[in-house]
From Swiss-Prot:
Keywords: Cytoplasm. GO terms for cellular component: cytoplasm. It comes from Clostridium botulinum (strain Kyoto / Type A2). Belongs to the UPF0291 family. It is found in: Cytoplasm. This is UPF0291 protein CLM_2971.
Length: 62
């Protein structure tokens, strides 16, 4: 599932839970989708951090 559809479904289930409640199956789906979203975000952050290089500070003499 692409990120946009994933977020739309998560938001839909959240709104439904507040308005009328969720079935047991929908609660399971909501948890699964949230876990998938978190895993994607974690993966993106990991890739970003792996691409970071430390740049040494220049030596300054007064």
């Amino acid at each position: 599932m692409d990120m946009k559809k994933l977020i739309e479904r998560i938001n839909f289930l959240y709104k439904k839970s507040k308005e009328e409640g969720l079935t047991k199956e929908e609660k399971v789906e909501q948890q699964k989708l949230r876990r998938e979203y978190i895993d994607i975000i974690k993966g993106n952050v990991k890739v970003q951090l792996e691409g970071v290089e430390k740049i040494p500070k220049p030596n300054r003499k007064n």
